[in-house]
């Protein structure tokens, strides 16, 4: 008999999962077999719809709550107390104890994993009391310890907050803390770092790896990011359309992939450094197709958007009468210029103020002070009617198209909405314009009568881009527009955006935390930290000769799609993020910059890093 230490913690044997739909039976997973050993990280990689998440939910017996059925095969788990659990035939009461204690799960979308009506403290403490039988005081102390472990600033204050009060990155850190709370034997991580900044991602990956080493836990890591696979995996399982197409040690998968799909997946990964020596954006390679050669998108020297000393603050209420007791300094003294037909990328961690800058430009959030000028018009001086007219020149593409599109309206109605609102097109002209927009974003016109839920994530984002283009804007603010998409779909959408820029002369303010993507699409880059721009300049200069210590830390944190270049714990020395909340009488120092080379500026004012 095998020694207990080398027996697998989890086994999938010929797993088959089906879903019943109006059109009949749909196979989610077919004939899937692999095992996960103690202290091992198995990365399950593939695109949306490949069956990665379905296989993980099957081991948790959660797939049945989503309409799935375990139609064949075996699932086995070895709990901490010993023995072997037949997961397929386990009773619901048994599985309730297993979830949390023996299997912890980190979900991709933290807003759906957290309860919006309970505080963070209540949600963390509830699981600790249930599974570990801790008292209220001990559970709260453990919750605080977990919050510190996942590097959440001001953890005591965050415990008292609700999920909607935290940024996306902070919410995901809370979900990770909840999954780690009971020190599970098997940790299932379903795209846990997809929407996180590179520094936080590097730390979370390091944290999961350290937990694995300390406890001997096994990790089933689900991702579509091959760079993350290179950093985390001992073994890799590649899935495509519900089936396993390749399995092997991580070095073998990267150095000598056998299946065509694995080769194509590796080819589509944007790698930091690929753009070295080039000044202008370039398209990404597409799965199964050669990228078409395009002329460099040079743009113009004529300024479109000028931002001077932009400051945005939010009041913090407290006390019995809910008076303003402090302010969040979200954006502090930000200035930049964006030329026509060019892309300026804002990069930085969650909470650094990059999204607030984008919203402040469109006055979706009212700035505290500063000046925003678009095409010679100053937005701050405008009446409501003039602002509405000016907004036709500026449009926004949000991170989650499922949230920004109305689930009850057809795609035709949604793309036509801005045209109707501004009265630019009617009747047949309206229909023709919407059809043209679908052609521009490379969607079939047969989709016009469909609803958002009938499309994939990449297709929904194309609809969001079509709606943003409806009024022929000059500026598009793309707020994490591709961060939640698969690598091949992301490449398609980015190439689409670059093609539209070349053809229509659009300017993009591209807000992102993905440095490899930013390197591909940008003419210029501004790095933000705690509300300030710490470094700004041409993309080639900022990426090839970074000057500010924070920019260097960001570059160092980017995972590289090469198992031989794994990041070590000692390389990841990030400083805790200071609080952006200050007293009402606090007066920040003005931003002072040094010009290193032409148009390459670095902040000299102390910014907390």
Language-model features and meaning:
Residues 5-8, 84, 153-157, 250-306, ...:
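Short catalytic/signature loops enriched in Gly
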Residues 70-85, 370-378:
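Conserved ABC transporter NBD signature motif
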Residues 81-104, 130, 252-257, 320-325, ...:
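ABC ATPase NBD coupling module
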Residues 138-157, 378, 428-446, 555:
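Conserved ABC ATPase "signature" region
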Residues 161-166, 170, 451-455, 459:
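Conserved ABC ATPase signature
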